[in-house]
Amino acid sequence: MKERIVNLETLDFETSQEVSLRPSLWEDFIGQEKIKSNLQISICAAKKRQESLDHMLFFGPPGLGKTSISHIIAKEMETNIKITAAPMIEKSGDLAAILTNLQAKDILFIDEIHRLSPAIEEVLYPAMEDFRLDIIIGSGPAAQTIKIDLPPFTLIGATTRAGMLSNPLRDRFGMSFRMQFYSPSELALIIKKAAIKLNQDIKEESADEIAKRSRGTPRIALRLLKRVRDFALVKNSSLMDLNITLHALNELGVNELGFDEADLAYLSLLANAQGRPVGLNTIAASMREDEGTIEDVIEPFLLANGYLERTAKGRIATPKTHALLKIPTLKSQTLF
């Protein structure tokens, strides 16, 4: 499948740009109000007690601000943050090297934490509970365990698949937060703030149009903003008006609902099944896509907006999908 403009993963060329647009203060972070409120209370209490924060877990679809909010937490706690991802921690020694380099109250952010191996989790448990690292040297009867004390730290885990976390690991997080999709008004505000940082003039209705097509996700909103800005530059326009915005978004293949070819192909597959559940493996084979991408990238927004139902037997298109695609259900078809 070709690269999607609404892909939820960070593209390689976007990393530095995303950092430059990342909010650094609570007042700059738009949305997730309930999470922000709870975190502000926890941070205030931890600072008054002069303690590290409880370990916390952020889960939800990609691109909703898990990393950004973790950076703000570190700044509010006036401490350092170490960023890594579970696939990078292959051996217990990798984790030990990270943990032993942390200072008191530092934050360790592990992305894709559901991908930690059971062996790594076993090393992590005493570190989370007792701030202690148990290192096994040797093997067999001669094996010895060396205990290394660690400074109090905060582990922030981020995952798109909370259901894949082992129960022992999940239970060790003192706080757990589900990241929600953003409203169009929140996304429009994010877009306008980003446009200011990019020194780009943008019309209100243009920001609203981009927001409407951003699938409730800031990462996609910022990507679309930058692509529309490219179209404006080519058109020799210093202003992103509605005409340029509509032309750009249509050329990018993102419709009024934020759907692209992959979304429509997915929904068509379900709708044409005429109420019969379609298994994930069948969908993946038909779309030539891996199951994880379908579950983590394509389905969450469609599911949240009522375009499909998940059952034990598979996925089923809803009447909303049939209406969108103008594919009648068997019940609505007549013999004449």
Curated annotation (Swiss-Prot):
Residues 1-182 are annotated as: Large ATPase domain (RuvB-L). Gene3D superfamilies: 1.10.8.60, P-loop containing nucleotide triphosphate hydrolases, Winged helix-like DNA-binding domain superfamily/Winged helix DNA-binding domain. GO terms for cellular component: cytoplasm; Holliday junction resolvase complex. It comes from the Bacteria. It catalyses: ATP + H2O = ADP + phosphate + H(+). Residues 183-253 are annotated as: Small ATPAse domain (RuvB-S). ATP binds at L21, R22, G63, K66, T67, S68, E129, D130, F131, R172, Y182, R219. It is found in: Cytoplasm. GO terms for molecular function: ATP binding; ATP hydrolysis activity; four-way junction DNA binding; four-way junction helicase activity. One of its GO terms (biological process) is DNA repair. Disulfide bonds: none annotated. DNA binds at R310, R315. Mg(2+) binds at T67. InterPro entries: AAA+_ATPase, AAA_lid_4, DNA_helicase_Holl-junc_RuvB, P-loop_NTPase, RuvB-like_N, RuvB_C, WH-like_DNA-bd_sf, WH_DNA-bd_sf. Its EC number is 3.6.4.-. Homohexamer. Forms an RuvA(8)-RuvB(12)-Holliday junction (HJ) complex. HJ DNA is sandwiched between 2 RuvA tetramers; dsDNA enters through RuvA and exits via RuvB. An RuvB hexamer assembles on each DNA strand where it exits the tetramer. Each RuvB hexamer is contacted by two RuvA subunits (via domain III) on 2 adjacent RuvB subunits; this complex drives branch migration. In the full resolvosome a probable DNA-RuvA(4)-RuvB(12)-RuvC(2) complex forms which resolves the HJ. PANTHER family: HOLLIDAY JUNCTION BRANCH MIGRATION COMPLEX SUBUNIT RUVB, PTHR42848. The RuvA-RuvB-RuvC complex processes Holliday junction (HJ) DNA during genetic recombination and DNA repair, while the RuvA-RuvB complex plays an important role in the rescue of blocked DNA replication forks via replication fork reversal (RFR). RuvA specifically binds to HJ cruciform DNA, conferring on it an open structure. The RuvB hexamer acts as an ATP-dependent pump, pulling dsDNA into and through the RuvAB complex. RuvB forms 2 homohexamers on either side of HJ DNA bound by 1 or 2 RuvA tetramers; 4 subunits per hexamer contact DNA at a time. Belongs to the RuvB family. Has 3 domains, the large (RuvB-L) and small ATPase (RuvB-S) domains and the C-terminal head (RuvB-H) domain. The head domain binds DNA, while the ATPase domains jointly bind ATP, ADP or are empty depending on the state of the subunit in the translocation cycle. During a single DNA translocation step the structure of each domain remains the same, but their relative positions change. This is Holliday junction branch migration complex subunit RuvB.
